[in-house]
Amino acid sequence: MSVEVVKRFKGNIEPGDHPYLQGPWSPQHEEVNADDLVVLEGSVPTDIDGVYLRNTQNPLHQALGRYHPFDGDGMIHLAAFRDGKVQYRNRFVKTKGLAAEIEAGERLWAGLMEDPALSKRPGWGAHGALKDASSTDVVVHAGKALTTYYQCGEGYRMDPLTLDEAGIPDWSPEDGISAHTKVDEHTGELLFFNYSKKPPFMHYGVVDKNDTLVHYVPVPLPGPRLPHDMAFTRNYAILNDFPLYWDPEALKRDKHVVRFYKDQPSRFAIIPRRGQPEDIMWFEAEPTFVLHWLNAYEDGDEIILDGYFQEDPMPTNYDGAKPGYERMMSYLDQHKMGTKLHRWRFNLKTGKTTEQRLDDRIM
């Protein structure tokens, strides 16, 4: 095995006992290429030919206050498989925010758990004061890897084989691209949504296999929301409006206070993949919040959607957490949120929703 250090980045993370800055979460500040990795046990099948890409959070600079793992700078890790051998390389996602902080030698933007007033420059995303770290997801579309940010960012492209930079997509809209885009392997299309604090509060878009934006429509909501993921079937896209969102009264004071409104229903927008706002069918269901979807498909007049239902989207503080991190640790504990596999069935003829718990285990 040979290892080449391509570049070392100078960071200023202070040593400490933060649970998400040590062990497997320790920041990695080197970009490397490694050929012919050592196989510790067994062998790599010779018929595997392709690459595995993973997006991770690797903060380079000390947080302005309390660090949350979602704040870390994006870093793509690549494992390439061919002829029974594996190569590895990693690269930072060279976002505008990261470039500015490298030049300044310090953190310039507040994070998820910090006061937005700490930000030293205007930010990105629905929040408006955060750094677009492009550290949430990575998909491959139109021959390029596309990285995205959890509260809507510009999206950054890379070569999926070399991780060379390929810039921001020309079609990236003003309100950005959501955390999780979806690629239809049958049509080559990329489906996405975004959201903001201004009407209509959400948009839905389609980018064709040639990387051209061919569809972009508003999905009107009652107010600012915090959707994270979407799903799709052969003919429909599925978006959501969950009763977990910023307190409207606090927003008037520029305070981003997340609350769970348990007396309000979950709402699902089902729209034909090239549909208009008037084509949207809205369905209601039990109040919850779903961070990620598992699957969706059509079955006769129904659309079946599987995802992870949170029994308590606003859990109590995490006992034993480091002072100041009680809330963060509670959100990162699936047991406290009661996250369980759930199924929704939407009848397109009757407009009714039926629900079913698929497993009582915490997922």
Language model region names:
Residues 1-363:
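Beta-propeller domains
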